[in-house]
Amino acid sequence: QPLFQGLPANVGFVGADLTGKHKGLWGLNSLYSELKAMHFDYIADFHHVLRSKYLCLRFRLANKPVASICKGRAGKKKLVRRHDKVMENQKSSFRRYADVLEKLGLPVLLNFSSIYGEGKGNFAEIEPVTGPKEGQKWIGIAPFAKHRGKIYPLELQEQVIAHFAANPQVKVFLFGGGKNEQEVFDAWIAKYPSVVSMIGKLNMRTELNLMSHLDVMLSMDSANMHLASLVNIPVVSIWGATHPYAGFMGWKQLPVNTVQLDLSCRPCSVYGQKPCWRGDYACLRDIKPEQVIAKIEGIVG
């Protein structure tokens, strides 16, 4: 729910407990009953998966106008196939969401800037953890992603971290979570004491607050790219098995800030879960740390 903070008065949030009372078919029927009682005029399905399809079916049977997202699977399939790729920039997910609302006669202006409007989060709320900024350049680094095909090799990422950790005018914050990531962060912090791990120090809401005070975020094709985008921070994003053309670039992020290699085999996956058919993950391993450093320095100076 922290992602839905600062909603206008005419927007509400309803959570679905898919592991509890809304689990399974009976749970979905219960969720439908709860939603039906709210007397919606239109139903917009931005997800278009089995659960949401079932809810849409129930609403259609109740004569409610329903529109669902078109995910553009055909175009994405041509983009990632092994041979005869069609390298066409697919419609962004944001545009696809807006299209759903337009089908219902509700046109949308895509002019969002940040969950903090034109400002930033309350710095006093995070200063006890981060310390004062005092003219430093703050760089966030989110080195992990869900799938190997989206993770820049850690030994190469460490070279990027070492470069910026040596600069007293720069402070590096590491973003992640989980035991394995904590172990990697602990090893880096032992070598580079000026680097700070944020694991376990902030909740989602205050982590977004911190991101709003960064000068740049370095991220894989991962959730952190999108979180930083929500607070209007430039992101240097590294792309391996996946590609910005699939439509999943962060909100208002610039293509010039992407780091990727022009290989005939990529992209090979829409979401990055497929193993590398070459076996060497050259799309990531062949990216030089100097390329990443140059992109970051192009933003922070």
Language-model-detected regions and their locations in the chain:
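Catalytic machinery of carbohydrate-active enzymes
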Residues: 1-301
